A protein has these predicted regions:
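Short, acidic Ser/Thr/Gly-rich low-complexity loop/linker segments typical of extracellular
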Residues: 126-141
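Membrane-proximal, glycine/serine-rich, low-complexity loop/turn segments characteristic
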Residues: 76, 112, 141, 161-166, ...
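N-terminal export/assembly leaders
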Residues: 18-98, 128-132, 194-198, 228-246
């Protein structure tokens, strides 16, 4: 303990020494354009350049604590398909997945709380091949550029039921993720064999669930965890709440290759941690799924699998092999993905009302544009462990992503102006080697010490081409003339990072204590050449400390804790540092063997971003601009969730109510501003509005029609949102519903799910989700499994996602279409082999990784 305390003290001291200047912002549901404007205002060295309309649909909900502007931009970009190019004095941010169409929506849970880091995959409706994907942010928002008119959206997250919806590539509003709520605390549910604890559900897979699964993703999909969506085609696990889902194997954070190499018959139980504690360190984490697995002590295990789509280009292929001898395990994993999409487009129609009474119209009409990428991932591993004593795990990873084509072309129309053709394409090559070392030591008196160290290098070569032409009959004819503007550039990025983490835990009979910390330091250097010339060097450090206490007294369980984070980001003379605190309480009471209640409460504090605070005006075009606001103040959020679970042999019911209130939230105001020439400029400005009141009621009954064979899951949800601004007041009411049925018998597994389009609301905007209609049929024979996945079934024309803006001066309707996603079929096959006996490998409790290259 003394050594551990000394390490934490040194980390804190080092972090303070490295943090002379910091950039600290708290963005909530802010458009990416607004965020970049805010950061631009906060930057003394750099000018941030971007195309306003290209990034406006992407929203940011993020606490930014960095040492410089480049790191701050990387932070807000997150998992969005964007690239940042840094020059001497100019930073260019662009969407690397250009498309006239975008799938825009928000993932929320049964309490109307955002689901963070959920995995969203857009599949070809014809063959279920992967088109593109994304991850929801801290507010549950997701924006996925896609040229298709419609696609089969698969949303998955630990603790939530996987959502399959055939959606148009447009704004689809809220997408409700339902928790598998038939689990009861301390009660073994016979149909699913589940025991519920204060922070998790412990699921013991049934024979049928194991028999019809070929890997960890299949097994998780069969479990139908509440609010979790498993995308078999994309090999991702998403949360209906929109947040992140973390996958672990024996308490060690697992990669996609690890889950694919997981043999279902080796899984003893699955822990669905639906209320992640502070020890996980990520406030955006919706759930943690931990597979408890028996390991071999002699012999080998291996397998190969492939998925091939029938529409567009789609292929996933994987292979793995593990060899065990005594206390050691040697492993190698390889995965390959290929995506090629032709029919992606994005449409935006806007109406602008001038104070004079005149009305103007401004439209972006999308052309089908291509999209192509391949990924290769190799992982070498070594594990040395003695059960109940120690575990040493070493992994060497190499990730390669090559995207030679990412087009997004549009016809631009505006009242009183000649039409223009916008030609856009991006190319990116990314290579990421990393080394991960983990050690866990079990000590006397039920104590454990776990240490993790990860070093990563990220090399990125990026090419961006953006040109505007006078439209002449057709796109081909238009590009024959000289471009009106050219925003093209090349970027080269190099990043080095080191992540160290240590945790100490002590268990008593009815109580457990966890204390720990993590320190993350990185150095990023991105060079931009072209329309933007810059060399951006970013230094980042982050220190996280936490303490958490969990216990149980007869019918009552609790989990309380507090976390503190100090982030530091510096870019040249610009930077910031700030402490943030996260109190969290979860209580659970068992009323009877069949009925339990759970209450969870947390307080969040959101601060304005540097870009929002900067008094800088940024023009997206001659018609629109974005201002900062130095008078912005932090705002507080209060989140309370009350749920009840009731179970009888043939039926389980989960009921959840959530109330979230934001006091003086930051949202966008839009006002017309008269210029000297008499024309009007529509100015968007972040301001502290009055309030945002969100109420949510969710009911998810599950009926076990035939025990262990046929289950029917239903979902109905009502949400009421009241937004009060300085000059507006809106109230939104929305009702959604859905159903999913799964039949398992013998070697067959058949499932179908359909859900109504979800919608989300913030300020004066509504974001629409997509309808879900997905079918999966698999057949297992000995070590083989064959399957057919149907994405966006009964949607032959693909998906359309919609969103709207209801400002009194500006009204907008946006649609993202994925035309080639409708009725898409994906054929799958896998083969596994093994030999030898097993043992239970020591658990790994920590794991870290870095995939953020900093280029936009």
């Amino acid at each position: 303990m003394r050594r551990f305390s000394a390490i934490i003290f040194l980390l804190c001291t080092f972090a303070l020494a490295m943090s002379a200047q910091h950039i600290q912002r708290n963005y909530h549901d802010r458009s990416m354009s607004d965020v970049l404007i805010d950061l631009d205002k906060a930057s003394k060295r750099y000018k941030i350049s971007f195309i306003y309309n290209e990034l406006e649909d992407f929203t940011v909900t993020q606490n930014v604590k960095t040492a410089n502007i480049p790191d701050a931009i990387r932070k807000v970009i997150g998992f969005y398909p964007m690239q940042m190019t840094v020059g001497d004095s100019l930073i260019t941010v662009e969407c690397i997945r250009k498309s006239e169409r975008k799938l825009i929506g928000r993932l929320i849970d049964n309490h109307n709380l955002p689901v963070e880091f959920a995995n969203i995959q857009l599949l070809n409706p014809k063959d279920s091949s992967f088109l593109c994907g994304g991850v929801s942010n801290a507010n549950g928002d997701f924006v996925i550029p896609c040229q298709q008119k419609q696609a089969l959206m698969k949303v998955s997250f630990v603790g939530y039921k996987t959502i399959y919806k055939l959606v148009p590539i447009a704004r689809i509003g809220n997408v409700r993720m339902q928790a598998n709520s038939y689990l009861l605390k301390g009660v073994t549910v016979e149909a699913a064999r589940v025991v519920e604890k204060v922070d998790r559900q412990i699921i013991f897979p049934t024979k049928e669930q194991v028999k019809t699964a070929s890997n960890g993703y299949d097994l998780l999909d069969n479990l139908s965890l509440p609010t979790i969506i498993v995308n078999r085609a994309e090999r991702k696990v998403l949360s209906l709440k929109g947040g992140e889902v973390q996958i672990r194997i024996n308490d060690v954070k697992a990669s996609m290759q690890d889950v694919l190499a997981l043999q279902p018959d080796e899984v003893t139980k699955v822990e669905f941690i639906n209320v992640p504690g502070l020890k996980y360190g990520d406030s955006n984490l919706d759930a943690v799924i931990n597979y408890q697995v028996r390991r071999r002590y002699a012999g080998y295990v291996g397998g190969v699998s492939t998925m091939q789509g029938t529409k567009a280009g789609f292929n996933n292929s994987d292979g793995y092999f593990k060899y065990n001898v005594k206390k050691s395990e040697f492993s190698i994993n390889y995965s390959f993905s290929y995506r090629s999409v032709e029919e992606r487009s994005y449409e935006s129609l806007g109406t602008y009302h001038l104070p004079t009474g005149e009305t103007l119209h401004r439209n972006y009409l999308g052309y089908d544009s291509p999209f192509l990428y391949t990924t290769n991932n190799v992982q070498l591993g070594y594990n040395l462990s003695e059960p109940d004593k120690y575990t040493l795990n070493v992994r060497l990873n190499f990730y390669n992503h090559n995207s030679p084509v990412r087009g997004m072309n549009q016809l631009y129309q505006e009242s009183g102006k000649a039409n223009q053709y916008l030609q856009n394409n991006r190319k990116m090559l990314e290579q990421i080697p990393s080394l991960d070392i983990y050690y866990s030591l079990n000590m006397p008196h039920d104590q454990n010490l776990a240490l993790n160290l990860v070093g990563t290098y990220i090399g990125t070569d990026y090419q961006y081409r953006m040109r505007e032409y006078t439209f002449n009959k057709s796109p081909d004819e238009s590009v024959k003339n000289a471009p009106l503007t050219d925003y093209s550039y090349d970027a080269t990025g190099r990043k080095r990072s080191l992540i160290g983490e240590g945790t100490y835990s002590k268990n008593w009979k009815q109580m457990a204590l966890s204390v720990g910390g993590q320190y993350n330091i990185s150095h990023t250097d991105n060079i931009y050449v072209g329309s933007s010339n810059a060399d951006t060097e970013l230094k980042y450090s982050n220190l996280y400390l936490f303490t958490q206490l969990q216990g149980q007294q007869k019918w009552f369980s609790y989990q309380v804790g507090v976390g503190a984070t100090r982030s530091s980001i510096h870019q040249g003379e610009n930077g910031y540092s700030k402490w943030l605190f996260r109190p969290q309480v979860t209580l659970q009471a068992k009323a009877s063997d069949r009925l339990s209640f759970k209450w969870s409460s947390k307080i969040t504090s959101d601060i304005p971003s540097l870009s929002d605070l900067s008094e800088l005006r940024q023009y997206s075009n001659s018609f629109e601009a974005r201002d900062g606001n130095s008078g912005l103040k932090p705002f507080t959020g209060y989140n309370n969730t009350l749920s009840a679970s009731w179970n009888i042999p043939l039926m389980s019911v989960y009921l959840e109510g959530n109330w979230t209130y934001y006091d003086k939230p930051i949202a966008t105001s839009i006002l017309p501003e008269k210029r000297e020439d008499g024309s009007y400029l529509f100015v968007s400005k972040p301001e502290n509005q009055k309030s945002h009141d969100y109420k949510h009621l969710l009911l998810t009954p599950e009926v076990h029609l035939i025990k262990d064979h046929l289950d029917l899951n239903l979902m109905c949800e009502y949400q009421n949102v009241k937004t009060k601004g300085l000059d507006y007041s809106h109230e939104f009411n929305y009702f959604s519903y859905g159903a999913e049925i799964r039949y398992m018998t013998g070697n067959w597994n058949i499932g179908y799910g359909a859900y109504k389009v979800e919608k989300s609301f913030w300020g004066e905007k509504t974001n629409g989700g997509e309808p879900t209609s997905n079918l999966a049929v698999t057949y297992s024979y000995k070590n083989w499994q064959f399957g057919v996945l149907g994405l966006f079934v009964f949607y032959p024309h693909g998906c359309v996602y919609k969103d709207e803006l209801f400002n009194k001066y500006v009204q907008q309707k946006n649609k993202v279409r994925l035309a080639d996603q409708g009725n898409m079929l994906v054929f799958a096959a896998s083969f596994n082999f093994s030999h030898g006996r097993r043992y239970h490998t020591g658990s790994r409790k920590l794991n870290n990784s870095d995939r953020d290259n900093g280029i936009r």
